[in-house]
Structures are given as structure tokens and as C-alpha cells.
Amino acid sequence: MIPKRHDGSAKTLFGLTRNFDAAEFCDTVLAQPKSAEYVAGRLWQQLASDDPPSPQALGRIVSAYGTGRDLRALTQAILTDEEFTGGRATVVNTPIEWLVGVIRALRVPAQPKMVHATLRTLGQRPFYPPSVGGWPSGQVWLSTASAGARLHAAIQLAHAGDLSSIESVAAGDRIDAVGYLIGVGAWSDRTVEALEPLLHQPPQLVAAAVNTPEYLTS
């Protein structure tokens, strides 16, 4: 912080002019009629779906949020709402979520240079967002270019990781074993068909599995 750059004059916010401190600023913003819907909708898109909630779901979670702006109640309402519990594959995992998930699942030894290079290529370096609004979400992470980068990284990680739980089972059981290893409970018929040619190549099988729709979304 550079004190001489601080502007200590009064500011006008939503028609109110004063020297706002942090608490007054937040109170003024949260007093706006649409603030509850905005906050609830943004948290929904962080936790439940890349798409906004339906008007019905939004009404339920805003009601839980209440006039007291209870974030714990709002979070609980989202995670127990029927549109959340009944949904599947509605949130695209960010590059950081994807990469950390693969590294943890395969127990890959630390490889800082590879991690940094992969996240830089995928466009999500920690602490370097493109703007103060953070990184985008949703389909933007599923571009053709990012698919190539993910596959390249996945092959490296698969060769460096622990695949003993895959290699130790019969070839016919390996797709289920991969699902158990990376946390995918069920595969679509189309995905199974795509993975079957790789049954005798565990590293390639795992690399392909972590690039399927079932793993890239949650």
C-alpha cells in the first residue's frame, strides 16, 4: 500500500455520499434489493452448476439466505436443493481442479515444473487471474487446444503415477478399476467403447479416462 495514493474524499454509492469504511460499504451494497439474488446466484454457479438456477430454485435459496444474509444457510440450501441433488455433470472442472485431482488419485510425486507448465498452457496459473473477476467458468475450459494439453499432461502423469491397482486386475476389469481409482462411479456406453481398445495399455487407459466427460465434469 502507498499512502499518498489513497483517496480520502467522500464517495457516492447508490445515492449515498460519505467516507465509507469497509463495513459501511458492504452494508450499503447488501441493502440493495437485488443483492440477495445476485449473491445466491453466484454461489449456486460456484457449487451447483455453470448455468444459473431456475427461478424456483433461486427463490428457495434466497429465502434460506434471508434478511440476515446467512451464508451457512445459503450453502446448505444449495447443497440440499432438489435441482442440485438431481443434477449430474453440470459443472466443468477448472484446470486446477482437474490437475490436482489427477495428481492425488495417481499419487504422482511432486513435479513443480510440469504442473506450472501445464497450468500456464491451460490458462489458469494460481494467483494470476486474467482480471479482478477471476477466471471464467464452464465450456471455455473444454476447447480443442486445452484438450491436447490435458492429454499430454495426463500421459506424463500416468507414467509417473501409481497404477498398480489397474495393472494388478484382469484386463476386462480395468475400466471399472480406473473408475474406482479416479472417483468415477459409472461410465457411459460411449465412454466404455472408447476406453476398451486401451485395456492392455494402463498408462494410456488412465490418461484417456481422466479426459472423459465423466471426469471433466461434476
Q: Which residues fall in each region the model found?
A:
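Flexible, low-complexity segments enriched for small/polar residues
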Residues: 40-67, 75-218
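Loop/turn elements at helix/coil->beta-strand transitions in domains of secreted/extracellular proteins
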Residues: 35-37, 69-72
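Non-catalytic, conformational "gating/processing" segments within enzyme and secreted inhibitor domains
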Residues: 1-52
